[in-house]
Amino acid sequence: MPPCKLICATSGVSHQLSNVYFPSFLDLKQFASDTFQIPLDDILLLLPYGMILKKAGWDSRKLQQEGLEEIYVFDRGIFNEEIEFSPKPRFQLFKPLPSPISDSLQLDKNVILRNLGWLKALQSDVEFFQDVIKETYQDVQRLLECGTVMLEYLKNYCYEVEVLYNGNVDFLNKLHEDGASNQWHSFYDNILGNIKVSNQLLSSFFNYSELTEIEDSIHRLDRELNAKLKELKKSIDECYQQRTQLISDLDDVKKNSVVSSDDMDNQMVERFKEMATEIELVSNQYKEEASKDASKEKFETFKSVHVPKLQTISQAMFNKASTNLDTKATVQQKLQQLYLSVAKSQMSVIMVKSVLTKDVKTNMKFLKNEELKLSQVLDLPMCYGLYLIELYREQLWTDRYSQLRQQHESSLQHLLDDEVRQRNSWYKDFQWITRFLDVDSLLPSSVYIPSISDHKQVTLSQIKDYINQLASLNLGEPTINLLKSKVSQAELTGLHLPTDYALSKDSELIIEGYKARIKKLEHLLLDAQFHQYDSWPAGILNKETAMVQMFRNSTVSTKLQQSSTFDLPSSKQQHESNKTFEEFQNLQKDISKYSELTKTLETELSTLKSQLSHMEVEKNAYRESMTNLNKELSTLLIERENFYSEMNSRSENFKKHLGSLFEQNEELVRESEESRRKSEDLNKMKEDLLVNMATQEVQAEQERASLQEEVESLKKDLNQLQISKSKTIDAEFINFNKQLEKTLYDVFQGSIFILASIGLLLSKDQDGNFQIVRVKGLRKDLDSSLADMNSSMAKSVIAQEIKSTFESIKDQIDYKPHENFITYIEKLFGNQLFETSVIRRFNDIESLAKKLRKENKNKKLLLQKSARDKITIYNFQPGDLALFLPINDQELLLNSSISSLNSSFSSIDLNSSTQSVMQRPNVVKSDIAASILNGSSASITENIPLSKANRNPALNANGRPDTFNVNTQDSAKKHVVWAIFTATNTDIKYVLRNSTSNYELLKDREWAMGRISALEKHVVGDDSKNPFKFPRNTVWYEVDAFFNLD
C-alpha cells in the first residue's frame, strides 16, 4: 500500500504521512496547518475526484487500508478577491560565476587551488539546479492536479444541485401527467355524478366551489413554479457554461505551462561530472609532478575547451531552473484566478440550491398537499366502498359477539346461582361465627355483560350493487378487484374465545420455562462451589489440605501424653525418649520451615490479591473501553452503511441521468433524421421549382429570341434598304418598308396585348425609363380575341406614342423618321424588359396558385369534417351517422300477416316510439326528422305539436310511455325493434342487430343517434334469414352501431 501524501494547493509542496497516525480529524488539520503555514480555520481538505474530507468521514486506518494516496490541502483565502495572493519562492537562485583560471595569464598553484574551489562550488550549484528543476516540475504537476480536483469538486457540487433540480422537475412533470387537477372535473361529473348511495350522489360529499378554488391555486402555483424553475434552469446552464470555460482555461494553463523534465538534464549533469573529475585529476597531477610541461599542456586544453563547456552547462541549468520557477509562479497566479472563478460559480450554485431547498421545496410541499386534496375526489369511490365493507365486517363481528355474549352470560349465571346456594348453605350452618369475624357474603344476583350499540346496517347485496355501479362506469380493474378481495376478507371475520385447553397449555409452557430457569441456576451454583476450594470433599484433590489441618491440630503435649500411657522398660523408654526428642527437633525445624513457607505464601497471596484487584480494575476499564469502542464501531458501521446507501443512491441517480441522456440522444437522432428527410423534401421541391423556372425561362428566352430575330431581320432589311438606297425612291421598296414597319408594329402591339392579358402595363417612370407595372382590373375589360388590342393599347401612354408615331410615318418618304421609329422599338425590346416582367409575373402566379391550393385543401378538410357530422338518410355506409327509431311492434306477433308486417316498416312507422299505438302519441316522421336535422338541442317530444303529444295519457312511473305493458285482451308480449330512418327508397330496410347490450342501452328512449359500424345484407328467400316475415325478394340490412347517449 503506497503512503498517503498531503499536497498543498498553494505551493504544490507535498508531505508524506506514511508513519504518522492521527487519532482525530482535528489533529490532521493541525498538522496541515503547521506544515504549510495555513490558518486552521481556513483549511479545506479534498480527496481525489473532488470529494470533500469531513470530520465524520475521517478514519486514518480505514483510509490507509482503502489505499488513499493523496489529500489535497486548500487555503480558503485564495478564494477571496479581497486577499491579495503573491507566490513566494522557497529559495533564491544565484548565477554561476566564471572560472578564475579564465582571467589568469600565468598558471600557478594558487590559481589551481582557486579553480578547484570554484569547481566544487559550481558542481554543487549544478546539482542544486537539477534538484530545483525536478522539484519545480513535480510542484507544477501537483498544482495542476489540485486545479483538476477543485473542478471535480465544483462538478460534484453542481451535480447535487442538478439532481435536486431534476427531481423537482420530474415531480412536477408527474403531477402534470397524473395529477388530480387534470382529471377531477371529468371524474366528478361522469363518475361521482352517476353513483347514487343512500339516496344521494357521491358528488354531494364535496363542495364544488372549494375544489375549483383548490384547482385555481394549483394552477397558479404551477405557473409560479414553472417560471421559477425556468429561471433556475438558466442559472444552472450558466453555471455549466462557466464550468466548461473553467475546464478550457485549465487545459490552456496545462498547455502553456509545460515544464520538461527530460533526459538531457541528466546527460548534461553526467557530462559535467566527468569533465569536473578530469579537471580535478589534472590539477592534482600538476601540483605533485616535478616536470609540469605535459600537465601544463593538458591543463591549457582544459582551460580552452572544458572550462567553457562547464560554464555553458551550469548557465543552461541555471536558466532552465529560473524558467521553471517563473513558470510555476505563472501557474500559481493563473490557478488563483481560476479558484476565484470557481468561488463565483459556486456562489451562484449555492443561490440556486438555496432557492431549491427553501422556496421551491415549500411550494412543492404545498402543491403536493393541494393535489392530495383533489385526489380525494378520485379516491372517493374506492374509499366509500371500503367504508361499506368495514361497516359490513363490524356488523358480522357484532352479531357473533352478541351470540357469544348470550351463551356465556347464561353459563356464568348458572355458576353464580350455584355459588349463591353454596354460600347461603354455609352461612346457615356457621352464621354464629360472623359475630367474631368479618365475612363478606355479598354477591350480585345476576350476571350482566354489556352489549355493543348497533351500527349502521349494511348488507352484502348493497356492497355488490355498489361494486356493480363502479364496474358499469369503467372505474378500473384494480379498484374493483381490491373491493372484491376486501369483501371476501370481511366474510371470513370470526370471533373466538380462549378455551380451557388453551389456558392449560399456556400454563404448561410457563412451568416448563421455570424448570429450565431452575436448571440454569443450579449449574451456576455448581460452578461457584467448584471455584471455592474449601467446599471440596476430602478426596484426592483435597488430601494435602486435610493432612496439613490434621498436623496443625496435633500438638507435642498430646503426643507426650500418648507416649506416657504406655508402660515400657526404662532402657527402651530412654531410647524412645531420645528418638522422640529427635523427632521433636525435626518437627520444630519443619514447623519453622513451614511457618516461613506460610508467611511467603501469605505474602504471595496478598500480592496476588492486590494484583487480582488491579486486574479487576483493569478489566472494568477494558470493559468500559470496549463498550465505548463498540459504540464507536456501531456508529462507524452506521455511517459506512449510510455512506454506501448514499453512494448507491447517487449511482442509481447517475444511471437514471445517463438513461435520460441516452433517451435525449436518441430523440435528437430521430429529430436529426426527420430534419434531414424534410431537407431532402425541400431540396426536391426546390429542384422542381428550379426546373419549372428553367422551363419558363427557356420559353421566355425562345420568345425573346424569336422577337430578337424578327428585330434583327428587320435591322438587316433596313440596312439593306439603306445600302441599296438611291436618289430615286422606288415605290415597291417603300411598300416593302411599310410592310416591315407594319409587321414590327404588330409585334409590338401583340406584346402589349400579352402584357395586358396578364395584368401588366408598359409605362415610364419619373426619370423617363421604360417600366412594366402591375395594374389591378386591367384584365376585366379584355377579351380573348385580338379585337381588343386597341383598348389595351389605349391604356398605355407609350403604346399611344408609338401608335401615333407609326401613323405619322406611314406616308412620309424621309428616311429619318423611319429610322427613329426603328431605334425607339429597338430600345424598347433591347433591355429584356418584356422577358423579365413576364417571368416575374409567372412566378407570382405560381406562388398564388400554391397558396390557393393550400386554402382549398383546408376547405376540403372542413367540408369533410362537416360531412362526417351530418346525418345520413339514404345509401348508408359504415361510419355514417344515422337516426335510429323504434318500429311499431304490433305486427311482430306470431299471428301477424305479411301485409301488416310490410306496413310496419314504412317511413311513418319507422318514426313511431316503443309504445303501442293505443298508448303513445302518433309522432310523425317529419316532426322528428325536422328536429334532428335542424340541430336543435331539445328533445323530440319538445318539438312535437301539443295536439300530438297529448293524445296518450297513459304513462308509467318514470313519466315515459309504457313499452312493455301487457294487453288485457291479448297475453302475447310485445318486442321493440329499432330501425334507421330513411327519407327515400323505403323498400330497403335497415334494422338494428338484436343484441341485449344495444336494447338495454336504448331502453325507454324514443330516438337515438348512432354511428354505423357494420352492415350485413340479406335478401328474403325460401331458405334465407327472415325474422320479420318480409315479402319475398325484399332487401334488408342488419346493422351494428355505436351509440353516444350523452
From Swiss-Prot:
One of its GO terms (molecular function) is protein kinase binding. Keywords: Autophagy, Coiled coil, Membrane, Protein transport, Transport, Vacuole. It comes from the Eukaryota. It is found in: Preautophagosomal structure membrane; Vacuole membrane. GO terms for cellular component: Atg1/ULK1 kinase complex; phagophore assembly site membrane; vacuolar membrane. GO terms for biological process: autophagosome assembly; autophagy of mitochondrion; piecemeal microautophagy of the nucleus; protein transport; reticulophagy; ribophagy. Pfam families: ATG11, ATG17_like. Its main location: membrane. It is a peripheral membrane protein. The keyword Coiled coil applies. Residues 582-730 form a coiled coil. Homodimer. Involved in cytoplasm to vacuole transport (Cvt), pexophagy, mitophagy and nucleophagy. Recruits mitochondria for their selective degradation via autophagy (mitophagy) during starvation. Works as scaffold proteins that recruit ATG proteins to the pre-autophagosome (PAS), the site of vesicle/autophagosome formation. Required for the Cvt vesicles completion. Belongs to the ATG11 family. This is Autophagy-related protein 11. It comes from Kluyveromyces lactis (strain ATCC 8585 / CBS 2359 / DSM 70799 / NBRC 1267 / NRRL Y-1140 / WM37) (Yeast). The lineage of its organism: Eukaryota, Fungi, Dikarya, Ascomycota, Saccharomycotina.
